Structures are given as C-alpha cells and as structure tokens.
Amino acid sequence: MASYHLSVKTGGKGSASPHADYIAREGKYAREKDSDLEHKESGNMPAWAAHKPSEFWKAADTSERANGCTYREIEIALPRELKPEQRLELVRDFVQQEIGDRHAYQFAIHNPKAAIAGGEQPHAHIMFSERINDGIHRDPEQYFKRANTKEPDAVAQKRHVSGKHRPNAKNTLLPRGRRWADLQNKHLERYQHADRVDSRSLKAQGIDREPERHLGAGQVQRFDTEQLQAILERREAERQVQQSRDERDSVIDVTTSLREALSERDTLTLKQELKSEPEQESHSGRTFDFEKEPDKLNALVSDAMKDIQEEIDLQSLVNDAMAEFQGIHQEMERQRERERLAEKQRQQEKERQRLAEQIRQKPDKGWSFSR
C-alpha cells in the first residue's frame, strides 16, 4: 500500500561529504554484498564535479562559511507498487519539479527490507546545494564564498534561503508536501494502481488512529516476540478496516446504477405519456372502416403491442431495481458487521501496543530511515 512521507533536513559545515557517501553507498558505506542501493545520479554540477559529485560536497565542507548550510536534503518514501524503473521516473520528475536547473543535486534510491514484516521499503534521498546555479564558471573555493551582487563574476553564487530553520519554513514545506503527493498520485494512476496518498495529517483526513512511529533495525532487535506480534496484529487490523471501507465504497458505487435505473424508468414513463396524448387526439372523433383500411388496424394492433411490451419492460426494470436495492442493503449490513469486528480487533491490539510501549527502553524520536 502506498504511503506518504516527505521530510526536509539540513547539513552544516563538515557533514555534506559523509552524508553524500552514505546515500551513494560509497567510502566506508560501500558494501560488496546485499546492497540496498537501487539507483544514484547527480545533476547541475559545476564542471570540476560533473563526473565526481563527491568532489562538490567535499568543497562545500571545506569552503562554505562556518555557520553556512552545506546541503539541504529532501527525504521521500516511494510506492512499493511501482517497479524500480517507474520509481526512478517518479524521482526524476520530482527533482525536475522542485530543483530544476537551479541547484546542484545528487540523489539516491534505497530499497532495504523492512525490519519487522520484511517487505520492501523504497525511499529516496535528494541532496542539493542552496547555491543558485547562474552559469558562471567558478573554482571550488569561489563557488561557496559569499555572493557579490556588484561583481557576480568575481565570487560565488547567491544562496536560495528557504525551508527548515527559516521564517517561511511552513509556507515552503506544506506546499512541497502537497506537490509531492499530487505527483505520486499521478504516477500511481499512470500505471493503473488504485492506491492514493494524502499529505494531510490522519486527523485532517478523518482517520481515527494514532500514526505509527518509524522503528529502526536496532530498536526492532530489542523487541520480544510478543511485541512484534502486537505490531503485526495492529497493522493487520488497520488493513482490514481499510479493506472494509473500500468494500463499503464499492457498494455505494452500486447505488449509482440504481439511481440510473430509476431515472430510466421515469424517462420511459414520460415517453409513454407523451406518446399516448397525440394518439388520443387523433383517434377521438374519427372512426375507421377496418375492412377497407386493414393497414390502419395493423398499425393500431402494433402500437398496442408496443405499449404492452413497454409495460412489461418497465415492470421488469422496477423488479430488478428493487432486487438490487435489497442486495445493497444486505451487503451494507455485512460491511457494518465486518467493520465492527475489525474495530474491536484494532482496539484490542492498540491496548497491547500501549502496554508494549511502556516497556520499550529507548523510544525513537522522529522519523528517519535507518538504511
């Protein structure tokens, strides 16, 4: 099931190069076996780092101001439903949408196995520099110096100030989150997946449950069997509740066809009434000699048979509509019972989860992918 996650982080002087190695699985993070790296690439780099983006981040650590931001990172969860090449297409579209050709960037797609359920956890790390790319060639030292608006050729690019730890952080992050959700939904629709994501909080979506904390591999290893089972049962209960909602919605969709049937019945009735009026007018005050005008008799018989058939069809339509309505009512009753049982199971699991939380030694603070 597709899930929404977007967060923004910043890095200070000395942290860009190690973090770039981490997301690219290079340096001390390089692993020969069982790598979770699905893809990595970079763009908008100056000529001296075009083929080796690690040089760019090293220069940022060396030459950026002491209190400067060496990089900004957007971290996003990717839908499991999409294939690797489709996820890459999604990330590239997002990078083009949010960064374009304005900033040097590097991104990596990771796909580790979930610590509890063992499923895929595809996500992307997108690092970019706040320095705006103005097309002027500068060496590494000049690139990260304070911009000179009077002589832009002399020293570094201007910095784009936005996001976390800035006065307009909320105004930047929330619209970006909505854009990411919209783009992700477009790609899910493009590849014919029914799931959709929502950037709003669970409360804003009208979902009555607590958000689940992200659990790192180290924390999961400290859980006992009962704690792990409680988490899995909670997830299963939530899955059943969502399935019940989806099935209920599909039943509601069926009522649309019922309304259409009733509308069609009313239309047929109206047509019949309109048709009978001119016939009554034409037949009133006039008689036919059917022996001399057999065609008139045949026409009247044919019209009468059509009226009878329309009545039969109309009654059949009404009967079908009533049967469909009864089926809808019965199905909705079954859905209510399934939801009641699923809610009961969810409450039981929630209580077990609360007890498990009390004995947890080191609760996780915030969301962060561990791999």
UniProtKB/Swiss-Prot annotation:
Q: Which UniProt keywords apply?
A: Conjugation, Mobility protein, Plasmid
Q: Does the keyword Amino-acid biosynthesis apply?
A: no
Source species: Salmonella typhimurium
- The organism sits in which domain of life? Bacteria
Q: What is this protein called?
A: 43 kDa relaxation protein
- Function description: This protein is probably required for relaxation complex formation.
Keyword Cell inner membrane among UniProt keywords:
no
Show the coiled coil region(s): none
In this record, what's one Pfam family? MobA_MobL
UniProt lists the family membership as follows: Belongs to the MobA/MobL family.
Basic and acidic residues bias (residue ranges): 22-42, 196-215, 330-365
Q: Where is this region: Disordered?
A: 1-46, 150-172, 196-221, 263-291, 328-371
